[in-house]
């Protein structure tokens, strides 16, 4: 395509025209730690991709930095040197074209296709402080900027900037400073001009300059980037140090990173001479051992699976205190938020699994994403969907099977994908990205979890051998290149000789998923598909069919299909008399739900319960999970409860954990059971309390209250010399932790709770780390059992410390402990408000709405607590420096912010839960508004409509 063929009016606004390709970046970065400024001297070497290009467009967000200078140079073949052909300064830079966002436009003349060009630039910008805990510096992630930035800037100005350089090492704030650059998905344009799209792969040469006084003050200061360090040398009369790093392989610019901070380090070199380094905070190097083990084993697995060795000489794992993502897969230098990488003494098996999964996920990106990269962000699922599946395949290859990672997959990935796909906000896996501002929105559960689930379905449909051969072909043909979803499916076509392209396009290009209904009659098994969203969509569906004697894979290619009993060695009478069954989605291998008829469904449940060491009907807990999830999706509460009663006692961790979620749904969904009014009937508080008590009794009856089993758990509350051997086998602790939830939170077992109370705060260090969340919840809920005011005060202080340092720091609370808030109702107002402020400052999750609402009811402080919420929201998200803006204006101006939307939805949801009394709602809003005099009178009516 020639330059003149490009139509500026038709091109997608997010993308720049592909008339040049950046071959190499040479970046020299200087960071002034005292003045919080940075300077970049850079050059980009380009080749032309079109005949006679008339312009050059490059990504840049110039509002974030000052362009000191910029030159366009052309390589003079005769002189064998570069020659400046155009020079631009800030005041003369052309304005970007209106229809291409965040870019600079340069007109060009007399450039031919084989000409080499070079862009030279110097930019200078300010570094923004984001987090006082560990003090992260990240000047290109605007998403997490808040009042914290201004507060920190003041601290920096008042306490540091004027300090003598020779005393800098005495300052703990600078010692804990971490400078990090996270580029994914398109943040690097906020630092310097570049080609900020994944389709542009380049080699990166990086140099870093730091002041000598900074380096001398902190001997353990580490400067880590994608490339291996070549040398460190003094410059500018020994006042600075220059770090020079090895060139990277070809990579997209979103993988560029560097980190500067004070770290300890552990390292090893594997059998393929790959250096593996794990960085940790000072004096915590043991916390990196788990991550090191995951990377060492993971590299072996991916080598074998892809048949391509890791293609670089090193891989670093670096924790940073503050980041929007859990981790980012930068080539050669993976960065993690602290909790996703560091495994300390007081962390649980759940946190161990989170760290293990995150390490294996990010490592898989060295192949899926970094070596083979999507052309554009609409195919981000090629990175994230595959990585989400492969983290589990990887772990399952070397971890103890007692860890039950596939159980976690069913709960956390598969079921959450179906649930996300059933929301009105769902979208295709492969989705258009029309604007750079939309890119972050597609890093969601559809790209990750649904993408993973449909690939898992293909894995089981083809079998591991064909699947592996197809993936190997895809990787080999496209290494160091960019690809699309279509290229992937064509590789599968070539290997399998099947039309995988047509089959899988339906799954990735349309939203929703099928619901299969089963009708068993004397002649055959009839299966019909309908779309969850009630549309006319149809899918080609791999059916994973099984009965007690046989399993078979059948491709359903129409709306309706009949299966003959003979094909399954099945007899109709066996189903009628309850001795056999038919399952259509065996072990939940397919991405769809199945609605069974009553007789067959009962057979599956009954035969599952009859299984033992001597009798096996080939029914797994995953099959039972599928039946429960279908009932939950349909909100068939009475049917759901009846099945749960048949399953009792529930001894499976997966099923008991899911039942815990069902219990919380029963409370939050205002569901109807056995002819009663709404479970959360707000008109009759007494009736509601009676109903909740009855629900609690139903769910408490699902566990086995075996005194010996309970005694065994009690003996593991605190670890000591007597029981430390019992603690070595932690694989049952996940089940036991959920069991304790039923016993002590749903069941209010006071005798067990009393054994949780500590004699001394030091006991907290010896608390069973796998029980710690549920034990703390039980202590919160039953603090009124303490016998004296001194004990109550003692535990109040303990809870404040726990909330501040542990409670919300783990993302596990988002998934497992939303309703833990209910257990604060006996705590003081100070403890409650501390938790509320913690959640508003660190956690974005509207699921807390129900928990807050119950807190209102139990605590009888609706107005005060709601106003505390509003005030906390106001402090964290409305103030901007010294300027205070209208709450309503802030909502209007930031309506596209996902983070803000979650906060706003939570506030609105709280009012919905308060009750049906409109006057009470108005009273709450008016009292809230009174705290914010800046809200104009004319805005109040609209504000009321927003919240009512």
For each of these PLM feature ranges, what is it?
Residues 1-313, 339, 344, 416-422, ...:
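Acidic/His-enriched low-complexity segments
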Residues 44, 245, 278-535, 665, ...:
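Hydrophobic alpha-helical and helix-loop surface patches within well-folded domains
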Residues 61, 472-476, 493, 505-509, ...:
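Short amphipathic alpha-helical surface patches that mediate protein-protein
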Residues 119-121, 363-365, 818, 868:
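Hydrophobic/aromatic beta-strand segments within beta-rich folds
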Residues 415, 445, 551, 555, ...:
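Long, ordered, helix-rich scaffold segments
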Residues 541:
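Basic, alpha-helical nucleic-acid-contacting "clamp/cap" segments
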Residues 556-570:
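Short, solvent-exposed S/T- and G/P-enriched segments that are highly enriched in secreted/extracellular
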